[in-house]
Amino acid sequence: MSQSLKRALFSALLVILVSYPILGLKLRTVGIKLEVLGADAQTLWTIAAAALAMFVWQLFRDRIPLKLGRGVGYKVNGSGLKNFLSLPSTQRWAVLALVVVAFVWPFFASRGAVDIATLILIYVMLGIGLNIVVGLAGLLDLGYVGFYAVGAYTYALLAEYAGFGFWTALPIAGMMAALFGFLLGFPVLRLRGDYLAIVTLGFGEIIRILLRNMTEITGGPNGIGSIPKPTLFGLTFERRAPEGMQTFHEFFGIAYNTNYKVILLYVVALLLVLLALFVINRLMRMPIGRAWEALREDEVACRALGLNPTIVKLSAFTIGASFAGFAGSFFAARQGLVTPESFTFIESAMILAIVVLGGMGSQLGVILAAVVMVLLQEMRGFNEYRMLIFGLTMIVMMIWRPQGLLPMQRPHLELKP
């Protein structure tokens, strides 16, 4: 099978897998349960047409510029379109357009769709953080959910015992998770491979068990509830404001609507993800980012270049853990309740699957994989087969596309005859 045909089939399948859960499946409330409704014929035809168009485009995209060039009477390089899309100005405008669409979209979408999108953004931030450790530094971390729990409980405890708000506790949660990453790094980062993975797995379980057994502080299995939501310049989005505060709808003189709270959570999550992407991309261009990549490729060569592998690993663990702390703090604010059972090994496995499925080191791959994984998780009608579908998907990916959906583009040279 030719490379173009493989690429076309994979792209068409990806369009179907992403489009059908978003456009085809609908949720209907029946009593206290949610029912999943299938797609109608028109939606199925639309998805099929989009998949067919993607298949044709990927199959003939290298030949189309040449045909167009001959038709109008001048020579066009087959890589011209690719070069145009790779121009910095083109990429900047494309990214700006996507950001604008992302900010405007929740005002026209349903509440359920916005809520799921917010959950996707949480996993995107977790994937970005773990991508530093696994994708860039090449360290297998199976206990990343422990830092996620530290961030969530930091905000919950600060709100419960000190009355801190979300915006005050957010940086503290990130720093606390980074501190735990730093403390974990010293005793374990001299380990490699499977030994490092086992120790990090134990760390995640230790954190969860401690949170469950420290009943007087953390509430034990019942967790901590009544965690306040984020505010907008001191305006709360609840129906009634606490003493000394004012509600959003009263300040602007509009009717109360619960959708305002959902949209605010989405916007806050989107801002955190955009900030995380900006920081990661800056770090990747700095010496510390180059050191992570050198460590991933060859630790012995990294040491030969004068770099201290322990310090490089420690920086990756610390910075990666801070992003989990930010995500955990926002998760606590969104849920309003945190319990130890929210931070099991399954969460670590899902975050790691997002990084591997998307392509280790690839930011766009993490975003796409988070969308696919969360949508798969939300398919309640297939709940019994969810883990089976998840396992089959990972097996197919390892066989067919082991580098991930959107692998990281690394600088390289090609010698052509």
Swiss-Prot record:
Presence of keyword Transport: yes
CDD domains on file: TM_PBP1_LivM_like
Keyword Transmembrane annotated: yes
GO molecular function term, any single one: branched-chain amino acid transmembrane transporter activity
Biological process, per Gene Ontology: branched-chain amino acid transport; D-alanine transmembrane transport
GO cellular component terms attached to this protein's record: plasma membrane
Keywords of this entry: Amino-acid transport, Cell inner membrane, Cell membrane, Membrane, Transmembrane, Transmembrane helix, Transport
Highest rank taxon of the organism: Bacteria
Subcellular location: Cell inner membrane
Membrane topology, record value: Multi-pass membrane protein
Membrane-spanning parts: 12-32, 36-56, 94-114, 119-139, 147-167, 169-189, 260-280, 311-331, 351-371, 387-407
Annotated InterPro entries: ABC_transp_permease, LivHM_N, LivM-like
Function: Component of the high affinity leucine, isoleucine, valine, transport system (LIV-I), which is operative without Na(+) and is specific for alanine and threonine, in addition to branched-chain amino acids.
Family in the record: Belongs to the binding-protein-dependent transport system permease family. LivHM subfamily.
Name listed for the protein in its UniProt record: High-affinity branched-chain amino acid transport system permease protein BraE
Biological source species: Pseudomonas aeruginosa (strain ATCC 15692 / DSM 22644 / CIP 104116 / JCM 14847 / LMG 12228 / 1C / PRS 101 / PAO1)
